[in-house]
């Protein structure tokens, strides 16, 4: 029997021993398949090639066995485990490898039972996206067992890792699964029969004979992805699926039990990417989404997100990514030098580096002040055009041509560098050639090169030239350099902002720049950038305390107006880089949102709840004033510097209490 469609998800069902035929350690894979004709989802099984005992041992390493006191050894053991899992799914024969290319049109050959896939062939280049499906949305609340916080005082690993090590657990929980307008509520006290009845509203259950055993296929009726909020505790997430697995397979006792093994960032002592995968149950994607309560991504965005993985979920590491071929050969000879996404970060000739006292993390603060005009050239679609010209259609996420989606583009780029070396080098080489040519052209125009941000924003300065002359020259330079170095006919979208005579950049954990003064985004960094720009612009020849006081009061008015606005204050932090106050749940094992507290520590701050009363508003004011002080020190004599310090202290004393008034 032949069937046309596409694979939407692939995982392991279990590893079993075929005693009758004396075949041991046989992996059974399960594929969530979208049938083209009926547009319905089906689950098929694939019989894999037998594993050797060593590989099986690496896959079956338990969480308890990974909890080593040597944290680096623990991290290495987890890396080894996920490498074995990824290698099993990606390299267990050509059939399984073909089915791991998601949304690619396939023709599959089924066995007589209509259950097992025997062969699979790619039958088209255009992606077959399941746009008529909807995601399952998980929401969960729970209570945790008490834990002595003295176990969490050290800072050698994440709080999440320490909590797991000392037996942190969920006492009780309640959760819901929502599909479209159907919301199903569950409690940890539900019986197995009740759970199965509820689940059958959005999943189909089918008991089938396979390889001399009975298997249970749990197939989502109209979904291939489950979404949960970034701020959902990962321990609650694990508890939900362990509960569902136990209850369902407790009712269907006669079947071969499906695996249900969680892989997430909390298993690494120093944290990992915000990505989750279950080996076995459930057979669908689990995606973490920012601010899910207010904004549910559409199916197109979910497809793009999955395609940007280049294979399996990111948490399964580089071995879980496809080796993507280059779609065209470059006519320019590529050098053999190592490439890096950080290559164009700073021109150190003009941007100084130092550690400032207001920095709470490990990074240096990079500072630049200039009396020259500053130009910010943005090419929002240059990465998309480069990828479109080099990546085969079957692997290219369908990026929206009307949206920048720069974060998704950068993630996709970073994932290419692990296994798709030739492709990654080709893209970076073209970008390098273009940027080098553009830099030379700017130098010939008398412009100084400062910074490249996120591979598509270029910061430059220029003295004494008319803006109406410079901008057309910059656009011409971009177009000519692009055409000569990339051989791509479509030109990138050109955007340019000019900042007159007040150029500055502060690049640290946060980013402040005179270029942000034109932004409409509501965030403290934008307000601070506008304040600093105004002060620098109007104090070229002398320090006028009357003017900077007025600007400071304007900034304070905006700060006060936003003092309850969570999104205005929160920032994202990498795990284990900063000292974090105790919080409930496992929430700091991947990139998380937080605000600064009064005692200099971070406080976890979710997007969807009220702003914590522990926030230290004075920190954000102090950061802004310290940057202004650095500018004063670089521009004026000791007398003005002393006067500024007095003024700074007076402003803090007179205004800081206003942010705490109700």
Swiss-Prot record:
Where it sits in the cell: the answer is:
Host nucleus
Q: What quaternary structure, including any partners, is listed in this protein's UniProt entry?
A: Associates with the primase and the helicase to form the helicase-primase complex. Interacts with the origin-binding protein. Interacts with the polymerase catalytic subunit.
Q: Which domain of life is it from?
A: Viruses
Keywords assigned:
DNA replication, Host nucleus
Its name, as the record gives it, is DNA helicase/primase complex-associated protein
Q: What does this protein do?
A: Component of the helicase/primase complex. Unwinds the DNA at the replication forks and generates single-stranded DNA for both leading and lagging strand synthesis. The primase synthesizes short RNA primers on the lagging strand that the polymerase presumably elongates using dNTPs. The primase-associated factor has no known catalytic activity in the complex and may serve to facilitate the formation of the replisome by directly interacting with the origin-binding protein and the polymerase.
Question: What Pfam families does the database record attribute to this sequence?
Answer: Herpes_HEPA
S-S bonds: none
Q: What's one GO-annotated cellular component?
A: host cell nucleus
* Principal subcellular localisation of the protein: host cell
């Amino acid at each position: 029997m032949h069937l046309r469609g596409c694979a939407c998800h692939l995982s392991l069902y279990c590893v079993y021993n075929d005693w009758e035929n004396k075949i041991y350690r046989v992996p059974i894979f399960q594929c969530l398949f979208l049938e083209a004709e009926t547009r319905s989802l089906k689950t098929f099984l694939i019989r894999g090639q037998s594993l050797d005992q060593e590989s099986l041992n690496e896959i079956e390493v338990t969480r308890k066995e990974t909890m080593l006191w040597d944290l680096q050894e623990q991290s290495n053991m987890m890396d080894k485990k996920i490498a074995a899992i990824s290698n099993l799914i990606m390299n267990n024969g050509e059939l399984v490898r073909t089915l791991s290319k998601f949304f690619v049109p396939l023709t599959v050959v089924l066995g007589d039972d209509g259950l097992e896939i025997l062969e699979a062939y790619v039958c088209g280049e255009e992606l077959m996206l399941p746009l008529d499906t909807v995601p399952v949305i998980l929401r969960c609340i729970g209570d945790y067992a008490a834990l002595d916080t003295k176990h969490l005082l050290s800072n050698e690993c994440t709080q999440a890792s320490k909590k797991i090590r000392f037996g942190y657990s969920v006492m009780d929980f309640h959760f819901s699964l929502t599909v479209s307008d159907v919301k199903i509520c569950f409690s940890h006290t539900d019986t197995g029969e009740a759970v199965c009845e509820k689940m059958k509203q959005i999943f189909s259950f089918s008991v089938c004979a396979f390889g001399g055993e009975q298997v249970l296929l749990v197939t989502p009726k109209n979904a291939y992805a489950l979404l949960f909020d970034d701020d959902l505790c990962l321990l609650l997430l694990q508890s939900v699926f362990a509960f569902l697995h136990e209850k369902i397979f407790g009712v269907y006792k006669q079947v071969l039990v499906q695996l249900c093994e969680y892989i997430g960032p909390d298993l690494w002592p120093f944290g990992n990417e915000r990505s989750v995968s279950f080996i076995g149950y459930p057979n669908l994607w689990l995606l973490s989404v920012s601010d899910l309560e207010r904004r549910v991504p559409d199916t197109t965005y979910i497809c793009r997100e999955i395609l940007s993985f280049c294979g399996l979920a990111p948490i399964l590491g580089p071995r879980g990514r496809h080796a993507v071929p280059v779609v065209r050969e470059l006519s320019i000879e590529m050098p053999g030098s190592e490439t890096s996404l950080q290559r164009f970060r700073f021109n150190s000739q003009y941007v100084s580096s130092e550690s400032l006292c207001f920095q709470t993390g490990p990074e240096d603060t990079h500072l630049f002040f200039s009396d020259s005009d500053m130009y910010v050239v943005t090419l929002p679609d240059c990465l998309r055009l480069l990828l479109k010209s080099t990546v085969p259609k079957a692997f290219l996420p369908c990026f929206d041509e009307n949206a920048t989606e720069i974060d998704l583009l950068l993630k996709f780029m970073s994932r290419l560098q692990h296994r798709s070396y030739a492709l990654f080098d080709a893209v970076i080489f073209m970008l390098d050639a273009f940027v080098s040519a553009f830099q030379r052209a700017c130098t010939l125009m008398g412009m100084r090169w400062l910074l490249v941000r996120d591979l598509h924003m270029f910061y430059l300065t220029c003295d004494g030239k008319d803006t109406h002359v410079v901008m057309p020259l910059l656009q011409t330079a971009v177009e000519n350099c692009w055409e000569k170095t990339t051989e791509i006919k479509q030109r990138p979208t050109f955007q340019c902002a000019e900042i007159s005579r007040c150029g500055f950049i502060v690049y640290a954990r946060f980013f402040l720049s005179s270029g942000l003064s034109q932004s409409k985004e509501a965030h403290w960094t934008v307000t601070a950038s506008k304040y600093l720009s105004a002060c620098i612009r109007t104090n070229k020849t002398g320090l006028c305390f009357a003017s900077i006081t007025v600007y400071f009061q304007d900034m304070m008015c905006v700060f006060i107006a936003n003092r309850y606005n969570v999104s205005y204050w929160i920032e994202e932090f990498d795990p284990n880089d900063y000292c974090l106050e105790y919080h409930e749940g496992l929430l700091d094992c991947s990139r998380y949102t937080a605000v600064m507290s009064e005692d200099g520590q971070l406080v976890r701050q979710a997007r969807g709840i009220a702003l914590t009363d522990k926030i230290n508003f004075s920190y954000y004011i102090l950061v802004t004033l310290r940057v202004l002080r650095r500018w004063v020190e670089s521009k004026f004599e000791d007398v003005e510097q002393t006067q500024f310090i007095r003024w700074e202290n007076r402003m803090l004393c007179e205004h800081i209490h206003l942010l705490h008034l109700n």
